[in-house]
């Protein structure tokens, strides 16, 4: 009997399965064999060159050429929209059962290619093996979970009342909008592209994906899975290229019926304000976070420090859910900082492809500069407890490596307000849970938050009063990070999200649909 495949999630704390590592090493070698190739856009079932090309180089070592990619144009986007509009009626008429069958086949292909795709992602954006493998697993599980939620809801087709008249037949049916644009980020290049594209297609829409240029290779892997699973021509289209042209055309073209964007608040809110022109159109934007953890005097400080460390420094802090600010009750502040610093200084930082690394590089020089500027401000205005340096020894000089950094600052400091997307966490002492919650809520964002307390009343107050969409209590695997499809819904409040509904949840697919009432009289 074959042993079940080990499931890797973001909450997986152990990485000592030797068979897993052997499989990953083989997949990584396969991924390395794909480096340096040229990849085209994909429109209406055909590969297409662009207006020149762009290169993607690994943040691990910029001597590594991940690939060369066709640079899409506004005209390419227009052709992709036209193809998607032509394909949409037949894709809808195919029926939801067949659509789900095709997309679930794509999930199986992603799982079967987990080691290779995880290796590609690790090289392309600098994830450690466990982070990369977890994300590939998440992408496949997103398809499976969204399919299950649709099936459990009879694909949103429900009879309504007839007020006692047997001749009247009424139904509520959810129908697709048409064509969706998906603009995905570099930091979760597979999960945050597969999630919205699969949900849109399940709903009967067709899709144009524009990935972050830094993660174009992962988008090619997604294309392979959809194409090999049998997604028809024109239903899924891929246009790579700059946000100023490809992204702008997707936002401005009236042939787009809905848009999904994951990225910065500035860009996301600009899309939200300007996307609807003649009439409202669905605009699903996830715009990051400045996520707080609260550590109270009753907390297990070992557990709290572990959770904060993992949430602050996993994928070098480049998660919208990363823990970047911590409010600690004053009596335990110094001890908590001591334990957190001790754990942080034990982390292995370096090339993420070998097994020992916990932190790899940040994505580019801009991220290095942002980290270094924050460190300079912390040195000027507070205390740098540990870290803060750029790492340039040997081969690290060819990548973008910085030390995980823990600082102490006044809670009014701008580094408690602004999202950094770097391995940097600020800690401040507070006098009460009331003060901690007030400070936590006094922020533009409202994505995730965590608390550590052994007092049930404190936990309940936190759950009732915190203004964020994803809450964690006493979580060693991550104070503010690690949501999983069907386990934790993931969506932001305030400046972190636009719809009030979350990804990874039972409500997600319905956001790609619109309600229609049918009344038929015999």
Residue positions per predicted region:
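Glycine-rich loop-to-alpha-helix module at the N-terminal edge of alpha/beta enzyme cores
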Residues: 57, 62-157
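Residues at or immediately preceding the N-termini of alpha-helices
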Residues: 42, 60, 74-77, 96, ...
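Rossmann-like NAD(P) dinucleotide-binding subdomain of oxidoreductase/dehydrogenase enzymes
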Residues: 122, 152-303, 430, 499
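ALDH superfamily catalytic-core signature
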Residues: 258, 266-411, 433-434, 438, ...
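Structural signal for hydrophobic packing residues in well-ordered secondary-structure cores
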Residues: 88, 92, 107-114, 118, ...
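Conserved C-terminal structural/oligomerization subdomain of aldehyde/semialdehyde dehydrogenase
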Residues: 1, 64-67, 92, 96-97, ...
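Hydrophobic face of amphipathic alpha-helices that form TPR/SEL1-like repeat modules
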Residues: 1-66
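Residue-level signal for inorganic ion chemistry
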Residues: 45, 63, 84, 99, ...
């Amino acid at each position: 009997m074959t042993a079940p495949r080990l499931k890797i999630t973001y909450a997986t704390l152990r990485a000592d399965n030797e068979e897993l590592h052997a499989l990953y090493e083989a997949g990584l070698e396969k991924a390395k064999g794909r480096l340096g190739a040229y990849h085209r856009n994909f429109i209406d079932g055909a590969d297409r060159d662009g207006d020149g090309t762009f290169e993607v180089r690994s943040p691990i070592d910029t001597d590594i050429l991940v690939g060369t990619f066709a640079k899409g144009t506004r005209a390419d986007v227009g052709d992709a929209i036209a193809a998607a509009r032509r394909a949409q009626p037949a894709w809808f008429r195919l029926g939801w059962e067949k659509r789900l069958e095709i997309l679930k086949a794509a999930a199986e292909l992603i799982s079967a290619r987990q080691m290779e795709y995880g290796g590609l992602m690790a090289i392309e954006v600098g994830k450690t093996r466990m982070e990369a493998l977890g994300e590939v697993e998440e992408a496949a599980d997103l398809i499976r979970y969204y399919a299950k939620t649709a099936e459990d809801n009879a694909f949103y087709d429900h009879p309504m009342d007839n007020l006692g008249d047997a001749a009247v037949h009424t139904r509520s049916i959810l129908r697709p909008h048409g064509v969706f644009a998906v603009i995905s980020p570099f930091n979760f290049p597979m999960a945050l592209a597969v999630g919205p594209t699969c949900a849109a297609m399940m709903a009967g829409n067709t899709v144009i994906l524009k990935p972050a240029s830094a993660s174009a290779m992962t988008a090619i892997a997604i294309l392979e899975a959809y194409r090999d699973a049998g997604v028809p021509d024109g239903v899924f289209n891929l246009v790579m290229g700059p946000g100023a042209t490809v992204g702008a055309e997707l936002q401005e073209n009236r042939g787009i019926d809905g848009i999904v964007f994951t990225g910065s608040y500035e860009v996301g809110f600009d899309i939200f304000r300007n996307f609807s022109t003649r009439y409202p159109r669905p605009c699903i934007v996830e715009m990051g976070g400045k996520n707080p953890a609260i550590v109270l005097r009753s907390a297990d400080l070992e557990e709290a420090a572990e959770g904060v460390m993992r949430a602050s420094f996993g994928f070098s802090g480049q998660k919208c859910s990363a823990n970047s600010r911590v409010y600690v009750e004053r009596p335990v502040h110094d001890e908590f900082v001591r334990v957190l610093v001790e754990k942080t200084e034990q982390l292995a930082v370096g090339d993420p492809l070998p097994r020992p690394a916990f932190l790899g590089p940040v994505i580019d020089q801009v991220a290095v500069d942002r980290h270094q500027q924050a460190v300079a401000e912390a040195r000027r205005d507070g205390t740098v407890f540990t870290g803060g340096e750029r790492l340039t020894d040997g081969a690290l000089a060819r990548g973008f490596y910085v030390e995980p950094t823990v600082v102490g600052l006044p809670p009014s400091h701008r580094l408690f307000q602004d999202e950094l997307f770097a391995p940097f966490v600020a800690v401040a002492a507070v006098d009460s849970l009331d003060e901690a919650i007030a400070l936590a809520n006094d922020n533009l964002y409202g994505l995730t938050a965590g608390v550590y307390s052994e007092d049930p009343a404190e936990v309940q107050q936190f759950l009732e009063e915190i203004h964020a969409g994803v809450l964690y209590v006493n979580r060693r695997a991550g104070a503010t990070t690690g949501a999983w499809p069907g386990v934790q819904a993931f969506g932001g409040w305030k400046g972190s999200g636009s719809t009030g509904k979350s990804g990874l949840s039972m409500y997600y697919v319905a956001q790609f649909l619109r309600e229609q009432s049918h009344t038929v009289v015999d």
